[in-house]
Design a protein with these regions (language model features):
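NAD(P)+-binding Rossmann beta1-loop-alpha1 motif at the extreme N-terminus of oxidoreductases
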Residues: 1-63, 122
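Hydrophobic beta-strand scaffold residues
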Residues: 27, 47, 113-114, 155, ...
């Protein structure tokens, strides 16, 4: 039975702890807001007063914290109490730059560290499903593969480049935000046209554009802008979208229209829609 410390028991961290307790791990928890940690006592968790108290004697330490600054603060607080051989696994959605800067400091202090952000909701964490991205030393990954696999549906090892998982996590989250913004703009058009939002969404029961991330994205990454949907024609459709909203506030489409105009002005009008990436893909 593993002895685990878990620092940061908010929505996601608390759900991860629930899953660990169900699997039989001994878990000591700490949270800046103590009440969130205390809520896990009834399930069998032990609550520590400080990060150092939490990690003392633990075989592995998991973290799900708000941001890079707090990660650095908490790691500095518990490092003197960390058991020899303990492995620190950070599930925080942290910046690639912050993670890259953090790793040499941890190495110098003798801390064994993996960065392992996740794509999962709290309920997915309870049910041990979802996707976990892992970056860090191969030997540490191999040692932790079994317990990490128990936490999620799939573990994707991205190699020893320590900030790669952080980068991939924000790439993925960016698409979540784009989808939410795009749906908002669909609702704006629907409102302008007098169509209920729930009705507007039914188009996506038949037309499912998610596959274009791979299909068009591959071409864009290679700077292959041979047209299957000419940018100047896409810009015409964009005009129809903006007009349909009849002045309703929109989140993302006006910015895309601006990027289209800039690309057309640079001579990409007869290229593919993906040519809006020409300025950033070299």
């Amino acid at each position: 039975m593993a002895s685990v410390a878990f620092l940061g028991t908010g929505l996601l961290g608390g759900a991860m702890v629930e899953g660990m307790l169900r699997r039989g791990d001994q878990v000591t928890v700490w949270n800046r807001t103590e009440a969130k940690a205390r809520a896990l006592e009834a399930l069998g968790a032990k609550v520590a007063a400080t990060p150092g108290d939490a990690v003392a004697g633990a075989d592995r330490v998991h973290m799900t914290l708000p941001d890079d600054a707090i990660v650095d603060q908490i790691v500095a607080a518990f490092t003197p109490r960390l058991a020899a051989g303990a492995i620190v696994i950070d599930h925080t959605t942290a910046s690639p730059q912050g993670t890259k800067a953090r790793i040499p400091r941890l190495n110098a202090a003798g801390v064994k560290f993996l960065h392992a952000p996740v794509f999962m909701s709290p309920q997915m964490a309870r049910d041990s499903i979802g996707l976990m991205l892992v970056s860090g030393p191969q030997a540490l990954y191999d040692a932790m593969l079994a317990p990490l696999s128990a936490m999620t549906g799939e573990v994707w090892y991205l190699g020893e480049e320590g900030d790669r998982a952080a980068a991939y996590k924000i790439f993925g989250n960016s698409m979540l935000f784009v989808i939410a913004a795009g749906v908002t703009d669909v609702f704006a058009m629907a409102k302008g046209l007098g169509i209920p939002a729930t009705d507007a969404l039914t188009v996506f029961s038949k037309f499912q554009p998610g596959g274009l991330i791979k299909a068009r994205g591959d071409k864009m990454a290679r700077r292959d802008f041979s047209a299957t949907f000419e940018l100047k024609m896409a810009r015409k459709d964009m005009r129809l979208m903006l007009e349909a909203a009849t002045g309703q506030p929109m989140v993302v489409l006006p910015g895309i229209a601006k990027a289209m105009d800039e690309a057309i002005a640079k001579g990409h009008g007869q290229d593919d829609l993906g040519a809006i990436a020409a300025a950033v893909v070299k």
